[in-house]
Amino acid sequence: MQSFFRNILIAAALLAVPLAGTAQNAAAFLSVVPDARSAAMGGAGVALSADVFSALRNAAQLPFSEERFGAGYSYLPWMRDLTPRTALHTAAVYFKPDGKQAVSASFRYFSQYGSERTDEEGNVLGRLEPHDMAFDVGYSRTVAEGLSVALTARYVRSEPGTDDVAQTFAVDAGLFYRHAVAASHRVTFGFQAANVGGALDYGAGNRQLPWVLKAGAAAELGLSEAHGLTLTAETEYRLRPSELRGWSGSFGAEYRCFGILALRGG
């Protein structure tokens, strides 16, 4: 429980800046790292060990979770001094009916600071309260020793505050592999194709979702019974929108102590 609330607070602090940098594009909140762990590690998360936010970063990690059930919530304020009511809310849950498969669900709600609508003479016609949301359902399963795959279906809805409402569907596909190289050391590899699907149509032309391909690797080193170190690196290729197409990369490290404290950087 302490870890749960600590993740909420850290996520709020670390992710305010990334959200500010991407909120200009259609459904850009889908590109925001929702959890404190991978955000603190430079955004690298596709090859990390499983936790509840694996439902979003790579659902193929979930069959290897040590817990049968998990639930989490993160709150990410955006430019609080300028837009006090703008934030991204994320909730995720997963369940493992057995040791080989997992089902997951998540919900993201991005509320934006509203503004007044006026006519040419300055008369107030109403208030705009734009918001976006996405709801996911995923299924993951091990297909060989150390290897799992996942498929996630996503519904995306965007309401700019006018009568126009844009909505579409997309999917994520993930792959995860882990291999023990010693009694307390292992390596993991992850791949994810995210937000592959339709476009948002606001009535004045389509706007593409942020299609991305991610691949990464991680090394988990058990330094002792109470201490551990994880090193990870990840590369990402953005396919759409076409004007943002290109490569990016991230890397990070995590030091764990007694299972209750983690120091991360990236």
Question: Which positions does each model-derived feature cover?
Answer:
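Bacterial N-terminal signal peptides that target proteins for export
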Residues: 1-9
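N-terminal signal peptide c-region/cleavage motif recognized by signal peptidases
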Residues: 17-18
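Subset of outer-membrane beta-barrel
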Residues: 24-266
